[in-house]
Amino acid sequence: MKTPITILMTLGLAVSAISQGKEMSLWPNEAPGALGQAPHDIPTLTPFLAPADNNSGSAIVICPGGGYGGLASHEGATYAQFLQKHGINGFVLKYRLGSAGYRHPIMLGDAARAIRTVRTHAKKWKIDPKKIGIMGSSAGGHLASTAITHFDNGDSKARDPIDRASSRPNAGILCYPVITMGKYTHQGSKRNLLGNNPPEELVNLLSSEKHVRKNTPPTFVWHTAEDRPVPVENSLLFASALREAGVPFALHVYQKGRHGIGLADKPPFKNVHPWANDLVFWLKEQGFIAK
């Protein structure tokens, strides 16, 4: 029989295994393009660092979904806790939204800054700067897809050391993502990102399937065939583009499941959706998790 002290110690270990760091602003002062100083005007990053005895040395920036109008916590902190359990340092990105008056390229700028921030502070967080990925669901998946198709090497002459770092992720994880701004898009996400009646040039620029190149990082993509708000064609289009460009990828399409299903579980993650275990297997293949 467990004593009360034993039970408390066990609970303490469980809590410490899922530790959340302090939310931090991506820019020390006002963010570029800020429309004000309210919380929704300040993009942030919240670290979920892996315990020292289970740190794989890899990191993933997580972009929650929400149609570019909100941020779903079950696609943010919950993902970070799951990754943390597997030794990956998760960083949940609070990016600026169309519902607060922001439009492209603000969101992509926030995602790029998040990648640069993790890379710049990699030593402090005991992270390999060559093992930093980005993950997103739904509209967050679109943001992640733009981050892996529109990146740069950084500005070597920048005064801010973070701006000198590359914004290229080393891996992409796209969960039932919005990919295209064309036929199969999610209209709410498109409107929040680009506004009403965007020019064709902008529609093409933000249709990620049109911008996959050889240097797009290896990507894990999954969707359900039953998804109606964001049709599976989005993932099929992106996987086809990855294949054509010769980029390593994994594509998983599951028959059942509503849009926005996430992990379909909560800590301690005993009954997650199969995609989560498929992702762990893929991350081992990429060297993000020890085999």
Q: How should each PLM-predicted stretch be described?
A:
Residues 64-69, 225:
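Active-site glycine-rich loops that stabilize anionic/oxyanionic intermediates
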